[in-house]
C-alpha cells in the first residue's frame, strides 16, 4: 500500500514538473506549435520508467511534429526531472499521445447526432399517425 502511494505521488510530481517544462522549459519550436497538456503519468513499479500521456490540440501534422519535438526533448526532460525531483535514479521518460479526449468528443458528437435523429423520427412518426387518422375519419 505504501509503495503504491509513493508511486502515485511520484507520478503526480512528474506530471506537475513536465507541465511546467512544457510552458517554460522546452525550447524546441515543434513543441510550441500545438497546445500540449499532460493528461496522465504512469510510473512503473520499479520507478525506472515513466509513460507521460500528452494531449495535443491541432491537426494531424501538428500532432506528429509536436510528438517528434517531445521525443527529441526526452533527454532534457529527464535531466530536468533529476534536478527538480530528488530520487536515486530518474525514470526514463516515454511520451505517449493521448487521444482519449478527442475520442470522447467524437463519441459525444455521435450521441448528439443520434439523439437529434431519434427526435426527428419521433416527430415524423407522430405527424404520420395524425395524418393517417385524419384519412380514416
UniProtKB/Swiss-Prot annotation:
GO cellular component: cytosol
Location relative to the cell: Cytoplasm
Function description: One of several proteins that assist in the late maturation steps of the functional core of the 30S ribosomal subunit. Associates with free 30S ribosomal subunits (but not with 30S subunits that are part of 70S ribosomes or polysomes). Required for efficient processing of 16S rRNA. May interact with the 5'-terminal helix region of 16S rRNA.
HAMAP family: RbfA
Superkingdom to which the source organism belongs: Bacteria
Keywords on record: Cytoplasm, Ribosome biogenesis
Protein family according to the UniProt entry: Belongs to the RbfA family.
Designated name of the protein: Ribosome-binding factor A
Principal place of residence: cytoplasm
Molecular-function GO term, any one: ribosomal small subunit binding
BP terms from Gene Ontology: maturation of SSU-rRNA
Pfam family, one: RBFA
Assembly with partners or alone: Monomer. Binds 30S ribosomal subunits, but not 50S ribosomal subunits or 70S ribosomes.
Amino acid at each position: 500500500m505504501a509503495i503504491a502511494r509513493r508511486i502515485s505521488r511520484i507520478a503526480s510530481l512528474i506530471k506537475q514538473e513536465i507541465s511546467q517544462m512544457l510552458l517554460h522549459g522546452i525550447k524546441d519550436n515543434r513543441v510550441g506549435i500545438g497546445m500540449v497538456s499532460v493528461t496522465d503519468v504512469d510510473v512503473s513499479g520499479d520507478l525506472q520508467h515513466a509513460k507521460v500521456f500528452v494531449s495535443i490540440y491541432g491537426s494531424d501534422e501538428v500532432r506528429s511534429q509536436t510528438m517528434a519535438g517531445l521525443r527529441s526533448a526526452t533527454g532534457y526532460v529527464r535531466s530536468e526531472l533529476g534536478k527538480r525531483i530528488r530520487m536515486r535514479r530518474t525514470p526514463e521518460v516515454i511520451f505517449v499521445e493521448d487521444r482519449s479526449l478527442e475520442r470522447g468528443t467524437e463519441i459525444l458528437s455521435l450521441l448528439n447526432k443520434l439523439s437529434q435523429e431519434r427526435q426527428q423520427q419521433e416527430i415524423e412518426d407522430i405527424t404520420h399517425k395524425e395524418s393517417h387518422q385524419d384519412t380514416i375519419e
